[in-house]
Amino acid sequence: MEAVLLPKSWNVDQILDDLDQHGFAIIDDAYSSEYIHQLVEECTSHLNQFRDAAIQNGIVSNIRSDHILWLHEELKISHQHTKTLYVLAEQFNRAFYLGINNVEAHFACYNSGEFYALHRDNPQGKNGRII
């Protein structure tokens, strides 16, 4: 199994500090323009696989109207991003004792007029999402 490292431009200590202090972290220039171009190419070559986005309660068109494609191993370029997120999750586990053992990510496509409204997609009693 290949070793996955966080990009050198990611300052893990700063990410952890920002998350601790503010509840979020912003990683400027997280990936190279070449990698982003590859992601866009992979995404656009799979547009026929996008599905209506849903929330915990199913498809609710007045909350979100975008279309998504969950990242998976067959999407080789974006799967590298998922593997990177697993490495970052390990850092979160060490720093905050979170117990993250699964990472999910998806592409989202917003056609003209589509939206994502503010909502809670992690209802009480079903708190499987940590970050």
Which residues fall in each region the model found?
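Non-heme Fe(II)/2-oxoglutarate
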Residues: 2-95
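Catalytic core of non-heme Fe(II) oxygenases with the double-stranded beta-helix
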Residues: 71-131
